[in-house]
């Protein structure tokens, strides 16, 4: 069948395959036409015998040219669905031949869009996909590794031996291989050989599921098996202007909200028990709650508190618990710590059925150096810059994405679309945006490279963020895109077509720092720091702001919110209630980290759960009830949210009484003309007969008082409300004469008469 030249060539090709140096196995293996006949070559390392199965028997394949290349000649093309029997060590099995399938999975249009950075559904091509080719079921593997000499699929199917399943290199640095009979749940990785011959075992960058840490393999998973029930929610969401709605977010970390005991494992639907995932090495008796358990426990809790959204700290797969999820290795996979992708889908589905939106922390700013991740992926700096002055966060020990590379940008932008489309999430919060925008972020002089204009702005990152937000709102007009941006970069929430970054909300870090600094001051000295309270209004309408008291403020020795407050316990509780009420009445959407809603005392610890036992004590119950009532009031009063980003929505009554540390203002709603009066007393003294100017005479009902007894206060107040009197003050002709409780916030609503 072969000439001597062909024999030498085939022996050489076999040697390259055996040494994992081959990038074109389809040029050697499977059906090969030679003049007017066909050669069938099967690659089967360490096999003793291989037979081609025919309708009327079988035909033995021989290996005269290389011990692992079994071949025969045929009169006709056998197609792709032929089967072979393989014998190894006395054991025989039947299978299809992977190299019979010559289909090109990534088409020309796919490659073109990917190379441009514009393939928004590239995850439909990349990764491991269960599919059927020529009536044969299996998995198509597809990977981008343009600098690799060779790539193999390794896993349970071949005892993790890279010699068995070399992939075919296509145009654009794409590698493909269809492996028959692989099924959902099978483990796999890619074995990548660099041009220098170094070997790297990598998890699938587009893997839809990964093993629970510390294991690192990817898992074959399905995309479209879950049956969603939230069509009404999704339709309504994308018809709604999210900024014209009340948004009150419960920020939380799934793994440290609440733990369970290993003695009470999760029971599957079939009655079996699930292997528990220990929550921490120091507490081996505790385990993480599963997605189904969180569905049962967390969602009713958040609904009872009245929050409109849950914000989950990163749940993309990550190897190190201590990173809080911010060092991602599995961008396309919900972490397996808590269960399966479909169980997370069911969690989101249930949130929607209970009227709760889901926001994910998304981390496109950096990635870890773990060997199985994206770092030095194909023997070159593929996803990151080679120069550490632009490619590394030394302080964080992580690498920075190369946003100038189209395929890298595509990886991230498509990832955004993936989470919204595949998991029906409602929003993202982009972490550490400032670290992306500035080339000198946390870098001393001489350790960063200026841009082409000589400045410190990272134009590539700006372009990436603009593209990401543009694509997001193009596909999902009702989405939330929230920036954690800690500088004064202009136009963070301005649309991209106006030169902005395109987010629709930005965390107000200035308000947060000013208010925490203010409340940590002894109340008797707050009179010298009134500007901390009032300054945020000066810039409030430069961006669409969200007020946040986040996880970052209750770690690393900063103390939890309650323990930031000065004074004895009574003052700590009162200060906490006053700060929360001021936050809910200040313009801007709201985000509150878990534990703050009931006065957690200890700093947040990712390896522990919240101090739920505190709810056995009335002051902590009172703070929780305060949050319940604030959220209820907030959602019921459009003046507190409808004109958050319109100057009409806020009007100072008086911000100059620093002697008494008292401020007063109105929140107004433009469509109905309704308004609320808010008065805050940030000293521990009761101010009796305190006059506050109001625009209209009449009765003002006291609809909220942080000093109410049910919240743990002294129950000082105004007997449910006050009639105004004629009194010129604060540029108004009418005034309310109020009793201001210590360390309190009052909310009053105008009514023409008491009834």
Curated annotation (Swiss-Prot):
UniProt KW keywords: Carbohydrate metabolism, Glycogen biosynthesis, Glycogen metabolism, Glycosyltransferase, Transferase
One Pfam family per UniProt: Alpha-amylase_C
Gene3D superfamilies per UniProt: Glycosidases (3.20.20.80), Golgi alpha-mannosidase II (2.60.40.1180), Immunoglobulins (2.60.40.10)
GO cellular component: cytosol
Enzyme Commission numbers on file: 2.4.1.18
Subunit comment: Monomer.
Protein name: 1,4-alpha-glucan branching enzyme GlgB
Organism lineage: Bacteria, Bacillati, Cyanobacteriota, Cyanophyceae, Synechococcales
């Amino acid at each position: 069948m072969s000439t001597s030249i062909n024999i030498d060539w085939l022996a050489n090709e076999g040697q390259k395959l055996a040494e994992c140096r081959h990038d074109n196995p389809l040029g050697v293996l499977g059906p090969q036409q030679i003049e007017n006949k066909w050669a069938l070559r099967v690659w089967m390392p360490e096999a003793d015998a291989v037979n081609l199965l025919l309708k009327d028997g079988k035909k033995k394949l021989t290996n005269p040219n290389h011990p692992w290349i079994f071949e025969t000649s045929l009169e006709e093309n056998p197609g792709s669905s032929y089967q072979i029997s393989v014998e190894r060590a006395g054991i025989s099995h039947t299978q299809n031949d992977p190299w019979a399938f010559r289909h090109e999975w990534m088409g020309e249009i796919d490659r073109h869009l990917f190379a441009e950075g514009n393939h928004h559904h590239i995850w439909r091509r990349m990764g491991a996909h269960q599919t059927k080719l020529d009536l044969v079921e299996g998995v198509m593997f597809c990977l981008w590794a343009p600098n690799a000499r060779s790539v193999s699929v390794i896993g349970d199917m071949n005892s993790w031996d890279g010699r068995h399943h070399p992939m075919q290199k296509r145009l654009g640095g794409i590698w493909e291989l269809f492996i028959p009979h692989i099924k959902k749940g099978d483990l796999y990785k890619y074995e990548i050989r660099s041009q220098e011959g170094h070997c790297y075992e990598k998890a699938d960058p587009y893997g839809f599921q990964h093993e629970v840490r510390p294991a690192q393999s990817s898992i074959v998973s399905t995309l479209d098996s879950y049956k969603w029930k939230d069509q009404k929610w999704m339709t309504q969401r994308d018809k709604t202007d999210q900024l014209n709605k009340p948004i009150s977010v419960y920020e939380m970390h799934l793994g440290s909200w609440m733990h369970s005991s290993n003695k009470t494992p999760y029971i599957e639907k079939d009655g079996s028990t699930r292997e528990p995932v220990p929550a921490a090495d120091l507490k081996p008796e505790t385990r993480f709650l599963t997605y189904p358990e969180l569905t049962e426990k967390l969602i009713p809790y958040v609904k009872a508190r009245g929050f409109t959204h849950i914000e989950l700290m990163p749940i993309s797969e990550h190897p190190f618990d201590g990173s809080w999820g911010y060092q991602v290795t599995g961008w396309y996979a919900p972490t397996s710590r808590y269960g399966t992708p479909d169980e997370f889908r069911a969690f989101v589905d249930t949130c929607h059925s209970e009227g709760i939106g889901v926001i994910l922390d998304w981390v496109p700013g950096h990635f870890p150096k773990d060997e199985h991740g994206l770092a030095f992926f194909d023997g070159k700096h593929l996803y990151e810059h080679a120069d550490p002055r632009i490619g590394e966060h030394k302080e964080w020990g992580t690498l920075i994405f190369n946003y100038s590379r189209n395929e890298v940008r595509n990886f991230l932008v498509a990832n955004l679309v993936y989470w919204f489309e595949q998991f029906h999430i409602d929003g993202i919060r982009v972490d550490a945006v400032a670290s992306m925008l500035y080339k000198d972020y946390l870098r001393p002089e001489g350790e960063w490279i200026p841009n082409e204009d000589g400045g410190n702005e990272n134009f590539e990152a700006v372009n990436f963020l603009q593209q990401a937000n543009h694509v997001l709102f193009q596909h999902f007009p009702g989405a939330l895109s929230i920036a954690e941006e800690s500088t004064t970069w202009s136009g963070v929430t301005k649309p991209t077509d106006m030169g902005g970054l395109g987010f629709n909300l930005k965390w107000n870090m200035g308000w947060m720092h000013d208010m925490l600094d203010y409340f940590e001051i002894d109340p008797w000295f707050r009179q010298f720091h009134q500007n901390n309270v009032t300054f945020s209004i000066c810039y409030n309408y430069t961006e669409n702001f969200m007020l946040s008291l986040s996880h970052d403020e209750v770690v690393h020795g900063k103390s939890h919110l309650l323990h930031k407050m000065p004074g004895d316990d009574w003052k700590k509780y009162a200060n906490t209630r006053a700060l929360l009420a001021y936050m809910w009445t200040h313009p801007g959407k709201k985000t509150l980290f878990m534990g703050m809603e009931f006065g957690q005392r200890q700093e947040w610890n990712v390896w522990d759960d919240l101090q739920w036992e505190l709810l056995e004590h009335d002051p902590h119950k009172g703070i929780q009830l305060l949050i319940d009532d604030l959220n209820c009031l907030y959602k019921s009063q459009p003046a507190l949210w409808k004109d958050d980003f319109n100057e009409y929505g806020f009007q100072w009554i008086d911000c100059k009484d620093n002697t008494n540390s008292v401020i007063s203002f109105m929140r107004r709603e433009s469509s109905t003309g309704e308004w609320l009066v808010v008065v805050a007393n940030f000293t521990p003294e009761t101010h009796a007969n305190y006059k506050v100017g109001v625009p209209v005479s009449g009765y003002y009902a006291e609809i909220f008082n942080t000093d109410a007894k049910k919240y743990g206060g002294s129950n000082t107040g105004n007997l449910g409300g006050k009639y105004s009197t004629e009194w010129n003050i604060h540029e108004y002709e009418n005034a309310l004469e109020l009793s201001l409780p210590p360390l309190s916030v009052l909310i009053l609503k105008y009514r023409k008469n008491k009834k």
